[in-house]
Swiss-Prot record:
NCBIfam families in UniProt: menE, PRK03640.1
One record GO biological process: menaquinone biosynthetic process
Keyword annotations from UniProtKB, A to Z: ATP-binding, Ligase, Menaquinone biosynthesis, Nucleotide-binding
Role according to the record: Converts 2-succinylbenzoate (OSB) to 2-succinylbenzoyl-CoA (OSB-CoA).
Species for this entry: Bacillus cereus (strain AH820)
Protein name, as recorded: 2-succinylbenzoate--CoA ligase
Catalytic activity: 2-succinylbenzoate + ATP + CoA = 2-succinylbenzoyl-CoA + AMP + diphosphate
InterPro entries documented for this protein: AMP-bd_C, AMP-bd_C_sf, AMP-binding_CS, AMP-dep_synth/lig_dom, ANL_N_sf, ATP-dep_AMP-bd_enzyme, MenE
Keyword Membrane on entry: no
Involved pathway(s): Quinol/quinone metabolism; 1,4-dihydroxy-2-naphthoate biosynthesis; 1,4-dihydroxy-2-naphthoate from chorismate: step 5/7; Quinol/quinone metabolism; menaquinone biosynthesis
Family membership noted in the UniProt record: Belongs to the ATP-dependent AMP-binding enzyme family. MenE subfamily.
Top-level EC class as recorded in UniProt: ligase
Top-level lineage group: Bacteria
Xref: CDD domains: OSB_CoA_lg
Length: 482
């Protein structure tokens, strides 16, 4: 088994120096230019004391600066702890303390008493020091730590090794194929594993990336039509935004793949994509699996509507209930295994032992496999609403709500109920005139009685994280305050 590999970006710059690596707005950077920038950043970081094996927090927005910092830390042999720019100061301080970082590199205004904070601009204006650049990467070494969104309890730092990132990129290429003219539009934040994984694919495949600094549906819509984009990663909300802008039109046939993640997609949305010939590949993955671990190819978009597909070539997947593997169509916990799966959480041995057993990761997600082995993700176990002993999946109710023409967005959570234990409550963003009664009546026609929300509340917008995933915990707080 391969233990080490040549430094990825350095090798890529050697193999295809003049090929475009990154496009951002009107700027183009080749792989050799990117390598040179990274060496320079690495020398500046060496001057401020960054050494091999240390953990360095990165709080930056999508841009060439953030890309160079992430690569520079790998050149130095340090571990990048990627922080979510949308978190509060308290949450960020907690994560930095938990990860035992030696400093923070940021492009934002941030003050911390106990941790040295270096602004990227200051570091780059300061002196350089000769750096000892890692010529090889050990696949067993940690490359990044990314905190889980903490949908349950305190966030946990997921350790991803060079080997995890390599396996993820290889698995994806065996699944989607590679083409010389590939260009991946990157609009996911790079502090999330979905965004970060594109940086890995960029240097491993030698593939051009069109980087969008912040989510801008108008720019992305136009770029898909004019910039030669072949692949884009999206979540349902982004796809809905793009379809609105597309209207009666279509995207060029060169767009060969829309990789859709971030939870089960509403059927009406997928049906619209089929009508328009947009190749949507539904995926399932998480921080712990270094991004996707399952993908449904566009061939099955309609015959397997709602499925997340089958595992990547080097991955395995099964459904367990109470530690026993269950037959097709039986619901249970999704359990996965593969070289892209994390070895554990930083300083959380209990959580690691609980989650990973004999190399199998217990995801905390509920789903089932059909008779052909296609995965259907039902919901997060923690999002499950149990009403009078019946399991209710919020995603199913949301799908019904989203099929109403006057509903733009929908989120469903459990609400405490004296009689049933829990009942569903819906939060809706309107796209036209509609009343609570009309919404509930609409649900009554399409859902079992016990699944119909007991109330529907209107919001201007739903709470979402930086990758546009619905934050149900914030909806739960709203329910508690009612």
């Amino acid at each position: 088994m391969m233990e080490t590999m040549p430094n990825w970006l350095k090798q890529r710059a050697f193999l295809t120096p003049d090929r475009t690596a990154i496009e951002i707005e009107e700027e183009k950077v080749t792989f050799m230019q990117l390598h040179e920038k990274v060496v320079s950043v690495c020398e500046h970081l060496t001057h401020v004391g960054v050494k091999r094996g240390q953990k360095v927090a990165v709080l930056m927005k999508n841009g060439i600066e953030m890309i160079t910092v992430i690569h520079a830390l790998s050149y130095a042999g340090a571990v990048a702890v990627l922080l979510n720019t949308r978190l509060s100061r308290e949450e960020l301080l907690w994560q930095m303390d938990d990860a035992e970082v030696i400093c923070l590199v940021t492009d934002q205004d941030f003050e911390a008493k106990d941790i040295p904070v270096y602004s990227f601009a200051e570091v780059m204006n300061g002196p350089k020091e000769e750096a000892s650049i890692q010529e090889e990467f050990s696949l067993r070494e940690a490359m990044t730590i990314i905190y889980t969104s903490g949908t349950t309890g305190k966030p946990k730092g997921v350790i991803l090794t060079y080997g995890n990132h390599w396996a993820s990129a290889v698995g994806s290429s065996l699944n989607l194929g590679l083409r010389d003219d590939d260009c991946w539009l990157a609009c996911m934040p790079m502090f999330h594993v979905g965004g970060l994984s594109l940086l890995m694919k960029n240097i491993m495949y030698g593939m051009r990336i069109l980087l969008v600094p912040k989510y801008d549906a108008d720019f992305i819509h136009k770029a898909l039509q004019t910039r030669g984009v072949t692949i884009i990663s999206v979540v349902s909300k982004m796809l809905t935004d793009l379809l609105e802008r597309l209207g009666e039109g279509t995207y060029p046939s060169s767009l060969r793949c829309m990789l859709l993640g971030g939870g089960p997609a509403p059927k009406p949305l997928l049906e619209t994509c089929v009508d328009k010939g947009i190749p949507v590949y539904q995926t399932y993955g998480m921080t712990e699996t270094s991004s996707q671990i399952c993908t449904l190819s566009a061939d099955y978009m309609l015959t397997k509507v709602g499925s997340a597909g089958k595992p990547l070539f080097q991955c395995q997947l099964r459904i367990e209930k109470d530690g026993v593997v269950v037959p097709p169509f039986a619901e249970g916990e999704i359990v996965v295994k593969g070289p892209n799966v994390t070895g554990g959480y930083f300083n959380r041995e209990d959580a690691t032992r609980e989650t990973i057993q004999n190399g199998w990761l217990h995801t905390g997600d509920l789903g089932y496999l059909d008779e052909e082995g296609f995965l259907y993700v039902l919901d997060r176990r923690s999002d499950l609403i149990i009403s009078g002993g019946e399991n209710i999946y919020p995603a199913q109710i949301e799908e019904v709500l989203l099929s109403h023409p006057m509903v733009a967005e929908a989120g469903v959570v459990g609400m405490t109920d004296d009689k049933w234990g829990q009942v569903p409550a819906a939060f809706v963003v309107k796209s036209g005139e509609i009343t609570e009664e009309e919404i509930l009546h609409f649900c009554e026609e399409k859902l079992a009685k016990y699944k119909v929300p007991k109330k529907a509340c209107f919001l201007e917008e739903l709470p979402r994280n930086a990758s546009k995933k619905l934050l149900r915990r914030e909806l739960r707080q709203l329910v508690e305050e009612m």
